[in-house]
């Protein structure tokens, strides 16, 4: 693997500041989704190694939380600077193991680093309260303290940003962390860990355990030393983890599945709506939890929008993410391809029509053509299930009440989008949509300064913003008698 800094390519896990193999010597191969080539391997660790990482995090906790917020911020700022200095290497590593175009990968590294920078400063603003006493001889004080050892389980679709969005607030608050990255994309996590060491993060404060999801996850959820778990992934797995954490009453943050509606009203700027649909639907080949999954277009502009979207999609360039000009890379694996094919076949069987794409790409493997379906019926699978691929199904709607009812008819509530010019409509629809995030006249919503998270079956808690650090803090009330 060609990197400017070859030491960023790590094939061992990090526990208590040491790079280690699995106790049993077993390993997991990591492949390039663009061509199937083996990139390397990482240790297939289990419960014993995870327990060792938790113990290390627990031992490191007293000294780390005893530092001042400014001292922790200095170390985190070093980490941010190193991420940006090594942006090209980190992006290349990400494209090789995840598949997204290099330009997108570079953007993700910048996005990931922004959480470290943001929370380095937010850690200095963990304020308490002084409450007017209920009695003359009492003083009431509220302070916030780090929750303790935390665990994070992160997905493959954003292998850097989903880590820093958790590690940033945890470390800034004075907590320590044990991370289990996705087995498809562990090298990004290990490279970040290498930079954390260089930044001055003490041994045991940030640990990365690779290996069996079941064995590692079970230890993270059952070990009483872990006081909080943060997970980004499917709703199905999130439910299981929440049940497991209930035994010890662990604090849980969950960022789960989505089924985002993308609504185009008849007063929308159609060119901007198409631009937003491209960004929301086809970024990362549609493999994002906030990507548009259902496109609702009002009758009066349906045909024009479909034509404009088709023209725009036809200009997308599919290929290996390292090649110049590529805008869509491969899907992560064969299962992802099969899910897209299943949703297309189901919609066609129920009356939808393909106007663009509709089948695997001529490159073969995990590549799939960007696809647009029109006249999609409400009972199609794609209206109820998250596709996680480059499929844009267009549904018709008559009026505001109709589309709000359709958009909210789902168990999910992560992100929604709509395009409209009427100011009254903007407020009515924005408030009526049952989602944690609403993008209005924009298809890009994620950043470090705003709260990210969903409602209903899409999760618990918020990441990013001033609220993101709260999930890593405990509130303590002290009543002082004079």
From Swiss-Prot:
UniProt record, GO biological process: cellular detoxification; gamma-aminobutyric acid catabolic process; protein homotetramerization
Active site (UniProt): 255, 289
Catalytic activity, as annotated: succinate semialdehyde + NADP(+) + H2O = succinate + NADPH + 2 H(+); 5-oxopentanoate + NADP(+) + H2O = glutarate + NADPH + 2 H(+)
InterPro entries for the chain: Ald_DH/histidinol_DH, Ald_DH_C, Ald_DH_CS_CYS, Ald_DH_CS_GLU, Ald_DH_N, Aldehyde_DH_dom, Aldehyde_DH_Superfamily, Succ_semiAld_DH
One Gene Ontology MF term: glutarate-semialdehyde dehydrogenase (NADP+) activity
TM helices/strands, residue ranges: none
Induction: Induced by RpoS in response to multiple stress conditions, including shifts to acidic pH, nitrogen limitation or high osmolarity as well as starvation or stationary phase. Induced by gamma-aminobutyrate (GABA).
Highest taxon of source: Bacteria
CDD domains from the UniProt entry: ALDH_F5_SSADH_GabD (cd07103)
Amino-acid positions noted as binding NADP(+) in the UniProt annotation, renumbered to this chain: 156-157, 180-183, 233-234, 256, 386
Main EC class the enzyme belongs to: oxidoreductase
Pathway the protein acts in: Amino-acid degradation; 4-aminobutanoate degradation; Amino-acid degradation
One of the record's GO cellular component terms: protein-containing complex
The protein's role, per its UniProt record: Catalyzes the NADP(+)-dependent oxidation of succinate semialdehyde to succinate. Thereby functions in a GABA degradation pathway that allows some E.coli strains to utilize GABA as a nitrogen source for growth. Also catalyzes the conversion of glutarate semialdehyde to glutarate, as part of a L-lysine degradation pathway that proceeds via cadaverine, glutarate and L-2-hydroxyglutarate.
Record's protein name: Succinate-semialdehyde dehydrogenase [NADP(+)] GabD
Source organism of this protein record: Escherichia coli (strain K12)
Taxonomic path: Bacteria, Pseudomonadati, Pseudomonadota, Gammaproteobacteria, Enterobacterales
């Amino acid at each position: 693997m060609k990197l400017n800094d070859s030491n960023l390519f790590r094939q061992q896990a990090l526990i208590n500041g040491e790079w280690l193999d699995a106790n049993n010597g077993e390993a997991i191969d990591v492949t390039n989704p663009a061509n199937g080539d083996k990139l390397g391997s990482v240790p297939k660790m289990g419960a014993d190694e995870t327990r060792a990482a938790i113990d290390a995090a627990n031992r490191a906790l007293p000294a780390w939380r005893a530092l001042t917020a400014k001292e922790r911020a200095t170390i985190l700022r070093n980490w941010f600077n190193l991420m940006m200095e090594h942006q090209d290497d980190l992006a290349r590593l990400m494209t090789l193991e995840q598949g997204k175009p290099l330009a997108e990968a570079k953007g993700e590294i910048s996005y990931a680093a922004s959480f470290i920078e943001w929370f380095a400063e937010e850690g200095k603003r963990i304020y308490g309260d002084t409450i007017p006493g209920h009695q003359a001889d009492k003083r009431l004080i509220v302070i916030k303290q780090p929750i303790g050892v935390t665990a994070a389980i992160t997905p493959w679709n954003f292998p850097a940003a989903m880590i820093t969005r958790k590690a940033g607030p945890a470390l800034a608050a004075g907590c320590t962390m044990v991370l289990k990255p996705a087995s498809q994309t562990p090298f990004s996590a290990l490279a970040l860990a290498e930079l954390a060491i260089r930044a001055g993060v003490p041994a045991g404060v940030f640990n990365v355990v690779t290996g069996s999801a079941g064995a590692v996850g079970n230890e993270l959820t059952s070990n009483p030393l872990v006081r909080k778990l943060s997970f980004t992934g499917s709703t199905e797995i999130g439910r299981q983890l929440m049940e497991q954490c209930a035994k010890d009453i662990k604090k849980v943050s969950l960022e789960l599945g989505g089924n985002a509606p993308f609504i185009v009203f008849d007063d929308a700027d159609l060119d901007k709506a198409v631009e937003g649909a491209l960004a929301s639907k086809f970024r990362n080949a549609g493999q994002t939890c906030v990507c548009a999954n259902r496109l609702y277009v009002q009758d009066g502009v349906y045909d024009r929008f479909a034509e404009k979207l088709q023209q725009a999609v036809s200009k997308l360039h599919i290929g290996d993410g390292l090649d110049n000009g590529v805008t869509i890379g491969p899907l992560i694996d064969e299962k992802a391809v099969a899910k897209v094919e299943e949703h297309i076949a189901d919609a066609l069987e129920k009356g939808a029509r393909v106007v663009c794409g509709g089948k695997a790409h001529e490159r073969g493997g995990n590549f799939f053509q960007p696809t647009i379906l029109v006249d999609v019926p409400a009972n199609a699978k794609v209206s109820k299930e998250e596709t996680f691929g480059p499929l844009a199904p267009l549904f018709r709607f008559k009026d505001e009440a109709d589309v709000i009812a359709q958009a909210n008819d789902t168990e999910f509530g992560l992100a929604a989008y709509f395009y409209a010019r009427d100011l009254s409509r903007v407020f009515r629809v924005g408030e009526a949509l049952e989602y944690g995030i609403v993008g209005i006249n924009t298809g890009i919503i994620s950043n470090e300064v705003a709260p990210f998270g969903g409602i209903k079956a899409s999760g618990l808690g918020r990441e990013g913003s001033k609220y993101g650090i709260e999930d890593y803090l405990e509130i303590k009330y002290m009543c002082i008698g004079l």
